[in-house]
Amino acid sequence: MNAITPRITIDGDDMDFIEGQYESPGNLGSASLTFHLPLSYAGDKKLWNKEVLFYFNKQDSSPMFRGWIRRTKVDLNQVEVFAQDALSYAVKDGGTSIAQLHLSEQDNLDGLSASAAIKEAIKRCKLTDKLGILGNTSPVVSSVRPPYRGTIQLLELIKSLLSKAVLNTSTIPRPNIARLIDNGNKSLLLIELQADLDNGPVVHTYTELNNILNINIVNRRLPSVVIVNGKGGVAGTFSHDTAISAFDRNYLTVTNDSLESPAECLDFAQKLFKANEAVQYEYGIETLEGAYLVENDVIRVETDDPKFAGNFRVIGKKVNFSPSSFSIGLNINRKPPTLAEYISSRDN
């Protein structure tokens, strides 16, 4: 394996770690860092909730991971440390109370853009010391319709606001996504359009002969019945008899408030089915290249079978490392943008 010089700090102090693993699932899931320290670091909870930074190379100006220690485990030889990033405060597996806020008729987020509403929600959840926001949706959408009321989990609010913004100016609609970045001082939730596989720049190319150690290909189940809900209660349903015969009834339901008639909803549903039909493969790649790839980057995979080759989006990443070696795992797919996990839907 190639030599690297990874670095881990806890509250600014460099750690003499033994080995570790960084894992980011993507799709607004919380990234984690698990690493092992010599037994001399053991102590009764003395590491809990301290800030951890992981640099893939010690020369990097910004960390690959910024998070907080959730738990430690001591055995006879070492201490295992588990940390999660800022999104862990908003997800169920965060090891802490889930961030939420209460909105009423008198105190709410009405009239704010999606970005401004998310920023205010983060402030109300008292997470501004751990999480900021950068960018806005394209097109810009408001938090007015429908109005948000009651007790709402922060992550569900973010997903709901993002699902309202779909850029429908091309053959395949493109939604907005959010992912964590680091500016060297703080984690930021970056809002951006999901990458265009056909026209976006290819960041890296993988081939079976040169830089792929192992590859797993998954043939996804296609949605055979697509239901699209539009504005003011209009809706359209598209079903495909051949797909139903092959995959049974696999439902997909999405909402697009820019559609104002049943005909527009039906046309949108047909686009979703056709997009799924053409790109139903997902990959898991083991490699030694691509440590700095991030979610939404476009890469190209070249295989002997052309139906498995083409451009893919990076979804998640795993890096196993020690002071002198590393390996990388990438999760990539061509799942049509409007089927992303940011829209509350079922697509597998």
Task: Show the residue positions of the predicted features.
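Short beta-strand and beta-hairpin "edge-sheet" elements
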Residues: 56-84, 172, 299-331
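Beta-strand-rich assembly/attachment modules of structural machines
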Residues: 1-114
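Acidic, small/polar-enriched beta strand-loop surface segments
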Residues: 1-2, 107, 159, 163, ...
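A broad, structure-centric signal for solvent-exposed, well-ordered loop/edge residues
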Residues: 15-17, 24-30, 76, 90, ...
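Short, solvent-exposed secondary-structure boundary motifs
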Residues: 4-16, 57-63, 157-173, 205-209, ...
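Intrinsically disordered, low-complexity segments enriched in small/polar residues
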Residues: 10, 18, 24-27, 41, ...
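Charged- and aromatic-enriched interaction segments used to assemble
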Residues: 75-78, 82-217
